[in-house]
Regions:
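Alpha/beta enzyme core
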Residues: 11, 20-29, 35-323
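N-terminal amphipathic/basic leader segments beginning at the initiator methionine
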Residues: 1-19
Length: 323
């Protein structure tokens, strides 16, 4: 006698009855690149279908998201001015600060998440302040990050998401938010962020590629898994409310481990390289885009993700409508 597993796979009705992994539009977070300037809608060469928008053109993107039922967005800034100290990152009239104010006034129903990092605002493209040898100075960078987070809070952001990978950033950000009356703003921390080649297209999109060197001294080494739990534990102890796993697809083992050990909300970030590879293969007719994307989304959910940051969010919403 043997177990007949196929009995529960015999028809779509049975498969739908017994499924236990669910995906909803409310699980989707859509990244948006806001470029400083006017009348800008610029497609990103390495990410077909993804654009940079100036604030005066952002309505067309937001209206489409509304119609599709997507209400969570993650903002990245592309400023005109950059310097060694990322001062534009905490400019009260900076591109993201102005975008937050505009969106929250005209589209209050959107959950606006602000990515907190220096790389989009530094002239050298690194995620912090550099010393004379070109190394990122951890504690000096914390001061800048906390200023960026506070400026977002003052502009009306719903969630701050530090992505820099400096030690102690959550504590510093949590302190400055509390001291200024913003203790109710959640911190969605990129607690797990590997030094990955899957980020390539994003760096074109955000104009944030390092001018020299790499980010291996502060982003995590994919050859070592021993620090994953410690990274998350430290961030949670310092005040993080949610954690992001980035990249997601190649690190589902880490995502699962974090969810099992801590039980906190976990966000999977399906990064630009994943998007571009799938798009390129689909454009060439090598894969079925819808099937691949939906399989990927359910994999994130099965591993324990509460939500997914994905450039495919609009497509996924349409697929869900199609059934």
């Amino acid at each position: 006698m043997y177990k007949r597993h196929r009995k529960l796979r015999n028809s779509s009705a049975i498969r739908n009855l017994v499924k236990n992994i669910y995906l909803e539009k409310g699980d989707l977070i859509y990244p948006i690149f806001i470029e400083e300037g006017e009348n800008i809608k610029r497609e990103i060469n390495s990410m077909p279908g993804i654009f940079r928008y100036s604030i005066d053109r952002i309505d067309e993107e937001l209206e489409e998201l509304k119609k599709l039922g997507i209400s969570s967005i993650l903002l990245f800034g592309v400023p005109l001015h950059k310097d060694e100290c990322a001062t534009e990152g905490y400019n009260e009239n900076g591109v993201i600060q102005n975008a937050i104010r505009y969106i929250k006034k005209k589209y209050p129903e959107f959950l606006v998440i602000g990515d907190v990092c220096c790389c989009e605002y530094t002239s050298h493209g690194h995620c912090g302040i550099l010393d004379e040898k070109g190394n990122v100075k951890n504690d000096e960078t914390l001061e800048v990050l906390s200023k960026i987070a506070l400026s977002y809070a003052k502009a009306g952001v719903d969630i701050v998401a530090p992505s820099d990978m400096m030690d102690g950033r959550v504590k510093k950000i949590s302190q400055i938010l509390s001291e200024n009356g913003f203790n109710n703003i959640p911190i969605m921390c990129y607690s797990i962020k590997y030094s990955s080649s899957f980020y390539g297209p994003f760096r074109e999109a955000a104009g944030s590629a390092p001018k020299f060197g790499d980010r291996k001294s502060y982003q995590m080494d994919f050859r070592y898994s021993g620090d994953a739990l410690s990274e998350v534990e430290a961030d949670l102890m310092q005040g993080a409310d949610m954690v992001i796993i980035k990249p997601a697809m190649a690190y589902l083992d880490i995502l699962y481990k974090i969810k099992e050990n801590f039980g906190v909300p976990v966000i999977a970030y399906s990064v630009s390289g994943e998007y571009s590879m799938i798009k390129a293969a689909a454009i060439n007719g090598w894969i079925d885009e819808k099937s691949i994307v939906m399989e990927q989304m359910y994999a994130f959910k099965r591993a324990g993700a509460n939500a997914v940051i994905t450039y495919f969010a609009k497509d996924v919403a349409r697929y869900l409508d199609e059934g």
